[in-house]
Amino acid sequence: VTSNVPDFRDPKVFWNEDTQLWNLILAAGQQMSIYSSKNLKDWTFESHFGEGYGNHDGVWECPDLIKMGNKWVLLCNINPGGPYGGSATQYFVGHFDGHKFTCESAPTVTKWLDYGKDQYATVTFNNAPNGRIVAIPWMSNWQYGNHVPTLQFRSANGLPRELGLFSYQGESYISVK
């Protein structure tokens, strides 16, 4: 999969049990692009998500798309544009049919996975024991990530977190343990 779109990067590939296809989600400028494949070699573009949804104050990157119960969650890391400046992870809850992600919230709603400054580039692990969804972030922020007092070290991973979903006043949110 190639493109001339700026910031076309960070592919996440996963097996979609519902459609019996591989899906790939990647950042493409200010949106996410979704592809499907039967064989991991030949990819078909399916759709984009993001225009008009959430925060667009920075570059969208490091996407993830996870099934949680009967809903899907799209993680979108953004830099800058976090609630306290610099990097952060926003997320969208909705439905995914293997071809298109549809957000259940209004386009103006922005949901943050974490409000701390040192949580970015969150990724999840597939097939964790007992069906758990485990995520791990990069424990840093691009506001100062290049200004650490070492030459090679650029911070560390954050603590693994188990993700879940809960509902409050008609909206779905991620819970973190």
Each model region followed by its residue ranges:
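Carbohydrate-active catalytic/glycan-binding domains of CAZyme proteins
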Residues: 1-177
